[in-house]
Amino acid sequence: MSNWDTKFLKKGYTFDDVLLIPAESHVLPNEVDLKTKLADNLTLNIPIITAAMDTVTGSKMAIAIARAGGLGVIHKNMSITEQAEEVRKVKRSENGVIIDPFFLTPEHKVSEAEELMQRYRISGVPIVETLANRKLVGIITNRDMRFISDYNAPISEHMTSEHLVTAAVGTDLETAERILHEHRIEKLPLVDNSGRLSGLITIKDIEKVIEFPHAAKDEFGRLLVAAAVGVTSDTFERAEALFEAGADAIVIDTAHGHSAGVLRKIAEIRAHFPNRTLIAGNIATAEGARALYDAGVDVVKVGIGPGSICTTRVVAGVGVPQVTAIYDAAAVAREYGKTIIADGGIKYSGDIVKALAAGGNAVMLGSMFAGTDEAPGETEIYQGRKFKTYRGMGSIAAMKKGSSDRYFQGSVNEANKLVPEGIEGRVAYKGAASDIVFQMLGGIRSGMGYVGAGDIQELHENAQFVEMSGAGLIESHPHDVQITNEAPNYSVH
């Protein structure tokens, strides 16, 4: 069947082409609810996700964004073991109740306890009689190890075993806090009726609950985290390891999600993991979204070529302007009762509001977080200013590191035979990710207040766009003035 007669299908819009029309509002910005449910086990308190890029999201970024209420996607440019370890770091960074605490036996060496404590940045380890029966017999903490000279000595010689303070399984955080304070201790092991170790509550975790009240967490009180996989020979092995490490979702990450090979692989992944949350992309059309949902995906990622470091649209001549792509995919998502993530092209907080208004349930951001302390990119000084490296996953360097399969070039062994669809660059250093999130949320709340939307669903239903001319875009930015003091949420690109 020929598509000749519809070759020039329609006009496409991106963020700089449109503005949201202000409307009658009974909503103040501080009253806006930013919660978004992407899947049954994936409810975020803010609609922000950090990209699965090797200069954006490792465990530090994932922890920071989850504490703010969003979600980080651990990139896959590392071994399966390393990526699974990154997921574990996030899941163990914060717990309401630690349901699977580390433990050792009295026969283990002190050095093994120290290694465990340093690797996971914990201050103590429960000690059980045997690995099989898990009967609690003691605990060893930093204080017990402070003056030890022989780290080859068995833990039994240095652990605290008398007057152990414990609590029953099911103890709530309020009761645990009272017990910890009363006995001046930092860790409270939870035991069952047989004295078996069944959990652990720490004062640090209680403090984190208070410090980060909006953190995005799973049913066990652990931070939410996702991780990326490709469509390769190790996909199932990697996905298995990531889920075992605690990942709440995997992101099947390809440049063209509406591809027969990708769809077959996704269907196989769904069959292999029938009850797990699958996010997949990228696509830019309604048909692409439909194909992914039919293959078994829970959440579709939308965006081909809009990213600041992506060259797909000029190298391959392919893509759909992002606002149109979001709107088209969202129409299908509504039909299926599922959700989409708008991935790429966002420069300002106002673009986030536009992406959500067009039908997005959350946005995925790369460049806006690449300059933060938590991003894994290297810091460098250029002309007296501080920058961090930022590169597309389609850049030569990233493809050599492991992302070539994303662009269907996994079989290419020579760097000079790779055809990149991204570039390497630098972005200005921005400080803590939490500061960036604060400004973003302020902008989102303000935009939703202007259009009278109390939550994201109301934004979907009621927001209206106006097409903007080139002169309108110029008028939208500061003009006819020299900026002398940049605002924290606006800079000239």
Swiss-Prot record:
Cofactor: K(+)
Function: Catalyzes the conversion of inosine 5'-phosphate (IMP) to xanthosine 5'-phosphate (XMP), the first committed and rate-limiting step in the de novo synthesis of guanine nucleotides, and therefore plays an important role in the regulation of cell growth.
Metal-binding as UniProt keyword: yes
Protein name according to UniProt: Inosine-5'-monophosphate dehydrogenase
PROSITE patterns the record matches: CBS, IMP_DH_GMP_RED
Source organism per UniProt: Streptococcus pyogenes
Activity versus pH, per record: Optimum pH is 7.8.
Catalytic activity: IMP + NAD(+) + H2O = XMP + NADH + H(+)
Annotated active site: 310 (thioimidate intermediate), 406 (proton acceptor)
InterPro entries the UniProt entry points to: Aldolase_TIM (IPR013785), CBS_dom (IPR000644), CBS_dom_sf (IPR046342), IMP_DH (IPR005990), IMP_DH/GMP_Rdtase_CS (IPR015875), IMP_DH_GMPRt (IPR001093)
Assembly and binders: Homotetramer.
Listed SMART domains: CBS, IMPDH
